[in-house]
């Protein structure tokens, strides 16, 4: 696997589209606050690009749209309970720490609230179990912290987080999460995400087994989703928007199977925009996928030419977000925005815990 020392950034495509071109009106009651009672029984909207048709199904019907030569590519990143509530050791004042990413040093880049008093040397206590000390202040005001905990009781910091941390739910989910597993995919393995790769939440172990039994390939990549995924686009010209970098990797084995199946006429179906961004980051113009370990800030919007992804499973995204722009790049802006209007009329559930879309 090739190790990259620089962030993958794609060439920006010139476009006359503005951020507002991706706006749609969404009633608050359509923002899903809870997951479906059964993961694979949410609604599924199927967009057929060739015929420009829209079908309405349930998610477990997705198997009917998959061929034996196809391959599903999922993001196996695991959400960490990255929201910590504690007190400042000096004054006892309440504070919140949000973990953004682990650095090579083993320290963490974090967001501290309130942050004004979080100077280098400041320390915070979390229930007497975990202590955080600020070691640096970086661009944007984020704080780098060092953690201290009982290493005899907890083997890793992730075990500490599992014990005392809270899931970093998106701001549009206002209800308390009863079960942490509701915000994890059933195949989540590698800790590191600050948000779930939500397209994968609809799969159950049973549905995946049925899909594999049909002969459909299955491969896992990893992209650790950062909080930047919720960052709004604040510029009018979309090509001027700056994407945050996110760590990813794809193994030799997965890259090889993708290339083999595609060479035989199979489609590569990305499960989620994160898997899609990995595949497009590691592919060459001829569509070949390469095993790479690195960081990507690829920004996909209409005008982008897809190289590796043939179909996409995704959720319904926020207006004017980079994610709805990516979906529009694959299926066409007018087709997608019309489909979103239909979804509102048909009372689909939106965002992280909402319903799904398949683009073929």
Give the location of each predicted region.
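Surface-exposed, charge/polar-rich loops and edge strands
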Residues: 2-360
């Amino acid at each position: 696997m090739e190790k990259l020392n620089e962030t993958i950034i794609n060439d920006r495509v010139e476009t006359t589209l503005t951020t507002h071109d991706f706006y749609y009106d969404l009633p608050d009651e359509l923002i899903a606050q809870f997951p479906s009672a059964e993961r694979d029984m949410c609604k599924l909207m199927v967009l057929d690009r060739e015929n420009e048709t829209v079908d309405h199904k349930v998610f477990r019907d997705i198997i009917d749209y998959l061929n034996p030569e196809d391959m599903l590519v999922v993001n196996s990143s695991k959400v960490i309970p990255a929201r910590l509530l504690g007190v400042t050791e000096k004054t006892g004042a309440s504070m919140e720490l949000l973990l953004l990413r682990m650095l090579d040093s083993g320290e963490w880049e974090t967001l501290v609230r309130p942050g004004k008093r979080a100077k280098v040397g400041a320390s915070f206590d979390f229930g007497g179990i975990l202590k955080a000390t600020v070691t640096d202040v970086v661009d944007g005001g984020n704080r780098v912290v060092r953690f201290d905990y009982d290493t005899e009781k907890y083997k890793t910091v992730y075990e500490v987080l599992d014990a005392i941390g809270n899931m970093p739910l998106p701001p549009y989910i206002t209800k308390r999460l009863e079960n942490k597993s509701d915000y994890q995919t059933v195949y989540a393995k590698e800790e590191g995400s600050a948000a779930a790769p939500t397209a994968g939440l609809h799969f159950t172990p049973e549905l995946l087994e049925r899909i594999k039994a049909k002969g459909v390939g299955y491969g896992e990549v990893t992209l650790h989703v950062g909080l930047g995924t919720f960052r709004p686009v604040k510029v009018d010209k979309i090509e001027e928007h700056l994407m945050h970098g996110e760590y990813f990797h794809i193994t030799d084995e997965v890259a090889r199977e993708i290339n083999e199946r595609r060479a035989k006429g199979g489609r590569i179906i990305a499960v989620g925009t994160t898997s899609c961004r990995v595949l497009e980051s590691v592919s060459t113009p001829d569509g070949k996928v390469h095993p790479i370990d690195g960081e990507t800030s690829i920004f996909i919007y209409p005008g982008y030419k897809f190289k590796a992804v043939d179909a996409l499973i995704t959720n319904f995204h926020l207006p004017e977000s980079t994610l709805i722009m990516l979906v529009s790049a694959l299926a066409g802006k007018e087709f997608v925005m019309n489909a979103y209007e239909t979804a509102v009329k048909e009372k689909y559930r939106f965002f992280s815990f909402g319903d799904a879309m398949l683009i073929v």
